[in-house]
A protein has these predicted regions:
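Short alpha-helical transmembrane segments in multi-pass integral membrane proteins
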Residues: 1-23, 78-141, 185-239, 296-361, ...
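N-terminal transmembrane alpha-helices
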Residues: 7-45, 58-73, 77, 100-107, ...
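Residue-level signal for transmembrane alpha-helical positions in Major Facilitator Superfamily
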Residues: 17, 32-33, 70, 109-113, ...
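Transmembrane helical elements of multi-pass membrane transporters/channels
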Residues: 18-37, 137, 148, 171, ...
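Small-residue-rich hydrophobic transmembrane alpha-helices
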Residues: 50-108, 145-164, 270-328, 332, ...
Length: 436
């Protein structure tokens, strides 16, 4: 019989590995089937292909950010009410309802206003057909991606972190295989990459839905059962996760515009390659922060505050070690990572330089992500929101306004490290006050 994880009294190191490892592997596999598009599209379509994907993807990223908000916000509430089936089912139903409403609105906006949306995010007349070719199939499958993203958080909160990981493994494996077939064997171009992503997302969502067959979770979407108060609570707790994820889209748009203005499609392509490479390390720290949340929120709900503090300190120690290792790997092996995407010498050179500059953000990014996740898990959404908003919008924007004036294109690369450094400085006083 499978041993049940004891969140309250179990060995901390074992619990940490049991929850953070599947969450981290899941997100790294998400990176792999996202980066598979980048590799196959760059090799099969050209550098303009990856620039097109990088312009269109922020909209998909926006919907994923919303579903992550619903999933983590709802899953945290479910963990607080562990054992209370009535409340668990209500929270679960609200998670699904919110995803359905958002998908309908976003899909309608994409299909009705494609051209102005893509042009606003940095596309030009040359890239627009490619962007549309990628976006249309992906938009159709985004409903499944949203459900899978939210359900991943719920499944983890239901003491099944490995099942959440398996769903991502299925999606990643299918995406890589189908990318190769559709782009190189069937010559479907950028649309082939979109079809591969769409099919893999559908498969992952279907697998996750199996977890709830015969479980205590029951879906009830009747209007009488829906509560705006519950929706507000879910959004309040999950909002920092939305900001962190949506920040990827916002930062991508801002930097795309800055790079296009500074050096055209070449610079935007270099940023696209760097963005894919950096995503691996970002996923590592996102996985750690998301994985530890169920442990923190469960013990916080049981008022076991000493254990909550111990978990935070332990997680920061692990994060520090991984940050140092990650930076060393990027400095010495970063050029080999970007070379996977393209063989163009000048593009590899600029991407490798940009990768190192951009990745200095890792010195503070892991620290920030863990703190934000901790604040969510201990029901401090206001402070978490302030930190997220400052990092994702205020500090990045300030960096883009100031740094390029002194260092040109290098200043654009350094805008994210600047934002994460300033966020860490802002966070420390809040953190000291809370953990006393």
């Amino acid at each position: 019989m499978k041993k049940k994880l004891d969140l309250e009294n179990g060995n901390l190191s074992e619990l940490f590995i049991s929850f953070t490892m599947p969450a981290t592997v899941s997100l790294i596999m998400t990176f792999l089937y996202t980066v598979a598009d980048g590799i196959f599209i760059t090799r099969g379509v050209g550098s303009s292909g990856i620039a097109a994907v990088n312009i269109g993807y922020p909209i998909i990223n926006f919907t994923v950010a919303l579903s992550l908000m619903f999933g983590i916000g709802g899953a945290t509430l479910i963990t607080f009410k562990k054992g209370n089936i009535r409340y668990q089912n209500r929270y679960f139903s609200h998670i699904i309802f919110l995803n359905i409403v958002v998908y309908i609105v976003v899909a309608a906006a994409i299909f009705l206003f494609t051209n102005p949306l893509m042009m606003a995010m940095g596309a030009n007349e040359e890239l627009l057909p490619m962007v549309k070719g990628y976006m249309y199939p992906c938009t159709v499958s985004t409903s499944f991606l949203m459900i899978a993203t939210s359900l991943n958080a719920v499944v983890r909160s239901d003491n099944a972190p490995k099942r959440a990981m398996h769903s991502t493994l299925i999606g990643a494996g299918m995406n890589i295989i189908l990318d190769y077939l559709f782009i190189f064997k069937f010559n479907l171009g950028i649309e082939g990459g979109a079809y591969a992503t769409a099919i893999s997302q559908i498969a992952a969502a279907i697998y996750l839905c199996r977890h709830f067959a015969g479980s205590t979770f029951k879906l009830d979407l009747s209007w009488k059962r829906l509560s705006f108060k519950i929706m507000k609570r879910i959004i309040s707790i999950g909002f920092p996760s939305f900001i962190l994820e949506f920040a990827v889209a916002i930062i991508t748009v801002l930097l795309n515009i800055a790079f296009m203005k500074e050096a055209g499609i070449f610079a935007a392509s270099a940023y696209g390659i760097t963005g894919y490479s950096f995503m691996l390390f970002r996923m590592l720290f996102t996985g750690l922060s998301q994985g530890v949340q169920p442990i923190v929120s469960y013990n916080y709900g049981r008022k076991n505050f000493a254990r909550v503090k111990k978990i935070l300190i332990y997680t920061h120690k692990v994060t520090f070690v991984l940050s140092v290792i990650s930076l060393i790997l990027i400095i010495f092996f970063g050029k080999y990572m970007v070379n996977i995407f393209t063989s163009d010498f000048e593009l590899v050179k600029e991407s490798a330089k940009g990768f190192i500059l951009y990745s200095t953000a890792l010195s503070f990014l892991g620290f920030n992500f863990v703190n934000i996740a901790y604040l969510q898990a201990v029901d401090r959404p206001k402070i978490s929101n302030i930190i997220c908003m400052s990092r994702s919008f205020v500090f990045v924007f300030i960096g883009l306004l100031i740094l390029p004036k002194y260092w040109g294109i290098n200043g654009i690369w350094l805008s994210l490290p600047f934002a994460d450094f300033m966020t860490a400085v802002l966070t420390i006083p809040f953190l000291k006050k809370i953990i006393k």
